UniProtKB/Swiss-Prot annotation:
Facilitative hexose transporter that mediates the transport of glucose, fructose and galactose. Likely mediates the bidirectional transfer of glucose across the plasma membrane of hepatocytes and is responsible for uptake of glucose by the beta cells; may comprise part of the glucose-sensing mechanism of the beta cell. May also participate with the Na(+)/glucose cotransporter in the transcellular transport of glucose in the small intestine and kidney. Also able to mediate the transport of dehydroascorbate. CDD domains: MFS_GLUT_Class1. Belongs to the major facilitator superfamily. Sugar transporter (TC 2.A.1.1) family. Glucose transporter subfamily. Glycans are attached at N62. It is found in: Cell membrane. It comes from Bos taurus. This is Solute carrier family 2, facilitated glucose transporter member 2. Coiled coil: none annotated.
Length: 510
């Protein structure tokens, strides 16, 4: 059967597409390694360097002169303390904005990825989106020459807009060009490219490579390289045959695209499947985001999709490096950054493993195994951290639990939500479904980025256990009752919901 064939054109198209996913991961991880270097630069630009703050304290403690004030007569020490606290708060504010502006941009743009893909086509939409990527990279790359805090915040926000667009575009495109039997494995490559980008950003962010006072701006602007490469390669990639056939009704172009992707003239099965989907789509009105929740045919699939993304984000995976650093320091590792890179490497390896497992073990099974494993690891992490002061050897228990936590995440909860949404819906509601799912993911990302430190301060070592206790029932209540057939992953799930919707209507009429 030709549908199982992996052709050079398919490899080129998927590789080119997931360069966007790589940029996504790179932009997530690149800001972490040079944190202290960038904060030091912020102090210099804003005139509140560490040396200045020390000088203020020394002056306040040793001088007998009155310091100017408009708020009565505080002592020199209180004036200096207030000045120091204000300076520290200013730096913290700009650093927090530098990190979180990326997620804000992603939240805003996530609604428009599918819509842009429908308006311009998948290839042209990616070309247009790369304009944002290049602008963001250039702002960050030249941030050392101007007001760095403003340029980095702006660049991160614009890069977030780009990543928000592609978080809907890439799963849609690679899901539409992939052969049916390889759709899950190819869909998982989106997540693999993301974690690879995170790992590469951690490596090149080492202080002896680019994460130092001289080269940190180049580190931030380096995402322009995959953006330029993708722009060049996109001219050689075929447009989505599903988009051409179903959306534009251009059968000849769709067949040409399919023949390139399949490497054969025998495309009867693909055309038959798309023809059936087009007939069904022609009977469907344009589906809005609101209709996904009000229409019984779409309600359960979209709720499942949202819960999958919520469970992914609120599992605590994005906060894992907060505790890993302290644990590795406690274990006596002089350079905990290398241990963190080790976690990133495990992250990448097990994502690659999931690519091969997803078609054999099934989506639901892998998600269940992953969530169950993370739940157990969270317990061991919490126990290890609670007992660390009494039993120093418990740090090794926590270290092992962190590595296993990441491994279980990438077996299922990491990659599966991204491509499952494209499989749940037909061509009509798919763009709206991808938009709302991407928005859900970005919203969870932003909430964790903004609140994790406060939750960790309040809950201490129980933070991961608490997050998983919250996300587990969300997953169970929606995903366990959703039986997803294997034979037609693009339509069977929705048809099942449509039948239930018809049955509900009949019951109401009776």
């Amino acid at each position: 059967m030709t549908e199982d064939k992996v052709t050079g054109t398919l490899v080129l198209a998927v590789f080119t597409a997931v360069l966007s996913s790589f940029q996504f991961g790179y932009d997530i991880g690149v800001i972490n390694a040079p944190q202290q270097v960038i904060i030091t630069h912020y102090r210099h630009v804003l005139g509140v360097s560490l040396d200045d703050r020390i000088a203020i304290n020394n002056y306040a403690l040793n001088s007998t002169e009155e310091l100017p004030t408009s708020l009565g007569d505080p002592t020199p020490v209180s004036w200096a303390e207030e000045e120091t606290m204000t300076s520290a708060s200013l730096i913290t504010m700009f650093w927090s904005l530098s990190v979180s502006s990326f997620a804000v941009g992603g939240m805003i743009a996530s609604f428009f990825g599918g819509l842009l893909g429908d308006k311009l086509g998948r290839i042209k939409a990616l070309l247009v989106a790369n304009i944002l990527s290049l602008v963001g990279a250039l702002l960050m790359g030249f941030s050392k020459l101007g007001p760095s805090h403003i340029l980095i915040i702006s660049g991160r926000g614009i890069s977030g807009l780009y990543c928000g667009l592609i978080s809907g575009l890439i799963p849609m495109y690679i899901g539409e060009i992939a052969p049916t039997t390889l759709r899950g494995a190819i869909g998982a490559l989106h997540q693999l490219a993301i974690v690879t980008g995170i790992l590469i950003s951690q490596i090149v962010g080492l202080d002896f490579i680019l994460g130092n006072h001289e080269l940190w701006h180049i580190l931030l602007g380096l995402s322009a390289v995959p953006a330029i490469l993708q722009c060049l390669l996109l001219f050689f990639c075929p447009e989505s045959p599903r988009y051409l056939y179903i959306k534009l009704d251009e059968e000849a172009k769709a067949k040409k695209s399919l023949k390139r992707l399949r490497g054969s003239d025998d495309i009867t099965k693909d055309i038959t499947e798309m023809r059936k989907e087009r007939e069904e789509a022609s009977n469907e009105k344009k589906v809005s985001i609101i209709q996904l929740f009000t229409n019984a045919s779409y309600r359960q699939p979209i709720l499942v999709a949202l819960m999958l993304h919520a469970a992914q984000q609120f599992s605590g995976i994005n906060g894992i490096f907060y505790y890993s650093t302290s644990i590795f320091q406690t274990a006596g590792i002089s350079q905990p950054v290398y241990a963190t890179i080790g976690v990133g490497a495990v992250n990448t390896v097990f994502t690659a493993v999931s690519v091969f497992l997803v078609e054999k073990a099934g989506r639901r099974s892998l998600f269940l195994i992953g969530m169950s494993g993370m739940f157990v690891c969270a317990i061991f992490m919490s126990v290890g951290l609670v007992l660390l002061s009494k039993f120093p050897w418990m740090n090794y228990v926590s270290m092992t639990a962190i590595f296993l936590f990441v491994s279980f995440f990438e077996i299922g909860p990491g990659p599966i939500p991204w491509f499952m949404v494209a499989e749940f819906f037909s061509q009509g509601p798919r763009p709206a479904a991808l938009a709302i799912a991407a928005f859900s993911n970005w919203t969870g990302n932003f909430i964790i980025a903004l609140c994790f430190q406060y939750i960790a301060d309040f809950c201490g070592p129980y933070v991961f256990f608490l997050l998983l206790v919250w996300s587990w029932p969300l997953f169970c209540s929606h995903f366990l009752k959703f039986q997803k057939p294997k034979e037609n992953p693009l339509r069977k799930s929705q048809q099942s919901s449509e039948r239930r919707g018809v049955q509900l209507k009949r019951q109401k009429l009776l």
